[in-house]
């Protein structure tokens, strides 16, 4: 069975369509939707059946946690523990935007949702559709790239349809995404004010360093 394609306005998402997306997430469905980098696969991160579905679809190694999209810095503090001023510095400068920040996970997320690492990767996207979904859902959503392992990331809905349209129930067509580079990833879970840039992406390394060394 082919996925349903649902067109949603990229800048002013229709509330009834956001409600429909949320209802699918609450059922445990996998939903492909646009972010500000690539199309991602969204599920309810506390629904372990749905989380396992993404790992099966992507043939993703079980020790690799899924990143989560959130709607605000306040939500990051609800999901994290043992945070420090580095999170504020990065969030103030780069959120919403293509920066993923790894922090120690709090108790609101099942350990399996962190791939048993105890850490969680968070991001506030600069894209209206996923932020509207998170706000309406009341929980973060997963955001792993909507592509098969080894295939190119998707910047438009047709690419998602061609790669995995027969394996997921719903694809949100919000037009092309704004960037063709992945997020930059910074690990703040090390504690004691330590940090590490794990991947340089849309935000150059030197910009991250400038902010963190202030």
Residue ranges and their predicted role:
Residues 1-214:
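Active-site-adjacent structural elements in enzyme catalytic cores
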């Amino acid at each position: 069975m082919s996925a349903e394609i649902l067109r949603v306005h990229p800048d002013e998402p229709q509330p009834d369509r956001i409600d429909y997306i949320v209802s699918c997430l609450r059922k445990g469905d996998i939903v492909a939707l646009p972010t500000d980098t690539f199309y991602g696969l969204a599920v309810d991160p506390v629904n372990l059946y749905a989380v396992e579905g993404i790992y099966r679809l992507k043939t993703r190694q079980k020790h690799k946690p899924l990143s989560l999209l959130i709607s605000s810095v306040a939500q990051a503090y609800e999901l994290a523990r043992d945070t420090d001023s580095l999170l504020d510095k990065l969030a103030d400068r780069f959120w919403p935007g293509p920066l993923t920040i790894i922090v120690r996970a709090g108790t609101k997320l099942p350990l399996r949702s962190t791939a048993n690492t105890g850490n969680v990767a968070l991001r506030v996207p600069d894209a209206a559709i996923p932020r509207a979904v998170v706000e309406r859902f009341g929980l973060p959503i997963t955001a792993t790239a909507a592509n098969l392992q080894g295939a190119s990331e998707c910047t438009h809905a047709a690419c998602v349809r061609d790669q995995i349209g027969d394996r997921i129930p719903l694809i949100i067509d919000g037009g092309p995404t704004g960037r063709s580079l992945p997020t930059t990833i910074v690990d703040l879970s090390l504690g004691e004010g330590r940090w590490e840039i794990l991947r340089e992406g849309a935000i150059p390394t030197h910009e991250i360093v400038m902010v963190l060394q202030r």
